[in-house]
Amino acid sequence: MGPENRRVLLATVLSVAVLIVWQFVFPSPKPKPQPPKPPEAAQRAEAPAAPAPGQPAAQAPAPAVPQDAPEQLVKLVGDGFEATLTSHGGAVKEIVLQGEKFRRDREGKPVQIDLVRVAKEQPYPLAVVATPELGGAEDAGNDVAARAPMRVVAQDARSATFEGRAGKATVRKTYRLTEKAYELALDLEVQAPATQGGGIVVLYPGYMPPDTKKGGFFSGPPVEFVRPVCRAGEETERFDVDGKEAQEKLQGTVAWAGMDQGYFVSAVFPAQPAGTCLFAKGPVQGSGLTALRLPLDGGSAKFGFTVYSGPKDLDHLRTYGREFESAIDYGAMARPFAFFARLLLFVMRWLERLVANWGLAIILLTVLVKVLLYPLTAKSMQSMNEMRKLQPEIEKLKAKHGNDREKLNLATMQLYQQHKVNPLGGCLPMLIQLPIWFALYATLQTSVELYREPFLWIHDLTVKDPLYVLPIAMGVSQYVMQRFSPQPADNAQAKMMLYFMPGFFTLLMLSVPAGLTLYIFVNNLLSIAQQQFMMRRMPAVPAPAKASK
């Protein structure tokens, strides 16, 4: 590889690295909390009609439950989770995932992950408000009716029914376990005066403590991460609870709506896509709300919902249809590599079934990629060897043209063409590896299969190496690889490639997921072995002659 092309490659790699570092080192500052804005008139437009709900027979309004009524709790144990329902709003107080994989450290002790995270000023998920008008989500989210006590009128091991008042309306909610993992069914019946009209608002709040790091290109989303999400029309939209906007109304009929929680998601599915969706900030900093708004037909209606709260397992999400797999967010920088990320996950799943460890699967993936790229790498090294043979001629051209860069570059390109040498041939293996790195990063940041998966001393391949052993080993291997590589004639450039690049990549990898660092480290070891093997098979190249003064 010639000096000019080494500079092009170095500039490309450094440019990508700077973009990565900028996102991590200089994150966007969090704005100061703003008081919620009142909903505008335009946001009170009538929602699209729900899918032909059946109208129940008229009944006398249920008596109101006293505000000081004691809280009643009902536990439903489903496939992979345990849900705790509360009479405060007839809502969901806890959704605790089962299994050793779904744990987090709290005060030094492992506890099961609870997907319900709300501030004390917020209602619980799946609270319902009946309103004369379909107003803003902020009004609904702060409405005392969303936390009004309800009574438990029926319960067994697989279901529970709550009944109470929401304004002038009677609300009856029945939760049922289904046969699917991480799933509840919710039947909702609303009885309201025929003159009331308006609609109901199903609320899904979330809270992220202000000191929670959202993660960046390097660090994945923490367990405490929350972000309102909704599939409306043909788009899946998300809302930043710490952003500038107080609320956002989405266009299009709602397929599902809920809360994005990093490797997990909680979502409400209407029986058929219906209603409208609105995001809003909550009453305290770090809190947010997704509101699914549905119209009432003649003041009363029945609605059916499916509720999913669990891991973002790609295959499982696809069983729901409605583009539910779009709940997996690869992020702005890794989104172009989403296809490759899914392909890598498919391959690693197959490898993991063979070796029963995700760390070993990543090592086998590295070997597989290296084997597939071997013909290209061999051709690249041959091209670099041919470039080294031309180095004496290039030195003569430098002596001839001196500081005239234009003439030197033109003469150099003519020399390459004369000897049929591709000056970019040595760059191709590195350039091809870059998309694989991005795709593997995206896989580690979004695939719950790799979440909390250990390898040797590393307790979780999706976060950084806690002992920094892998980044340091990767830096040493990078140095050795550069040492064995053909060096450019320019001493300053040679020193930069030999010392700066390994040091820079070591710093870069300190906060990168350990799984990605493992891939690059093993790739470096294989590259060193391949270099030694191929250099022994190639004819020796004489040292370049020094340019005459």
Curated annotation (Swiss-Prot):
Residues 29-39 have a biased composition (Pro residues). GO terms for molecular function: membrane insertase activity. It is found in: Cell inner membrane. GO terms for cellular component: plasma membrane. One of its GO terms (biological process) is protein insertion into membrane. It is a multi-pass membrane protein. Residues 40-49, 55-68 have a biased composition (Low complexity). Keywords: Cell inner membrane, Cell membrane, Chaperone, Membrane, Protein transport, Transmembrane, Transmembrane helix, Transport. Residues 29-68 are annotated as: Disordered. The keyword Hydrolase does not apply. It comes from the Bacteria. The chain crosses the membrane at residues 8-28, 328-348, 354-374, 424-444, 502-522. Interacts with the Sec translocase complex via SecD. Specifically interacts with transmembrane segments of nascent integral membrane proteins during membrane integration. Belongs to the OXA1/ALB3/YidC family. Type 1 subfamily. Required for the insertion and/or proper folding and/or complex formation of integral membrane proteins into the membrane. Involved in integration of membrane proteins that insert both dependently and independently of the Sec translocase complex, as well as at least some lipoproteins. Aids folding of multispanning membrane proteins. PANTHER family: CYTOCHROME C OXIDASE ASSEMBLY PROTEIN COX18, MITOCHONDRIAL, OXA1. This is Membrane protein insertase YidC.
